[in-house]
Amino acid sequence: SLLLTSSVQHHLLRRQTRTQISMVVEAGDVREIHHVALLIAYGAAAVNPYLAFESVEDLARDGFLTVGEEKAIANLRNALSTGVLKIMSKMGVSTIMSYRGAQLFEAVGLDDAVIDDYFTGTVSRVAGCGLDDLAEEVAIRHRVAYPNQWTATPHRNLRTGGDYKWRRTGEEHLNDP
C-alpha cells in the first residue's frame, strides 16, 4: 500500500493536481504504527487498517483479549493515533497537515529507479530491491496465504515472523541470542 500511495502522490504532484484530492488508504497490510506513519508521510489523508481491526475484533470475540470487540478496536485506533503523534513530535512536526506528504523518512534497501519513480525526493543511502524483487515478495506471501492444496480446516496459526525483534519461532538473524 505504501508503494501505491506514494506513486499516486507523486503522479498528482507531477500533474499539479495534488491539492484537488484527499487520499484515503484502505489496506490490509497496515498493522503497525510505523505503517500508518509512512502512509501519511507519503500522502494519505486517512488510513483504514481494516484487516488489523478485523483481527483485533476476532481476538476479542474468541476470548483471547480481556476486553470486548468495541473496546479492542478503540484501543487499537488509539494506539495507532497516539503512536503517529509521538513520531511526529519526535520529528519536530506539530500538525498533521505539515506531516502529510512531507516524506520525512529515509529509504533503506530500494534501488535508485524505485526511489526516483515512486518515492521521488526520498533520501536513500543503501540501495537494494527493484520492482521485480518487490513483486516476487508479494507473490511469495500470496502463495503462503493461498496455497494450492486447501485443507478441510483453515489454519489458525500465523507465523510471527520475528522481523524486528527476536522470537523463538521467528527468522534467524546474526544477532539472535
Region annotations inferred by a language model:
Residues 28, 44, 51-56:
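Short, ordered loop/turn segments at secondary-structure junctions
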Residues 14-17, 55-69:
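Catalytic-face loop-and-helix region of soluble metabolic enzyme cores
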Residues 20-28, 98-102:
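Beta-strand segments within the central parallel beta-sheet cores of soluble alpha/beta enzyme folds
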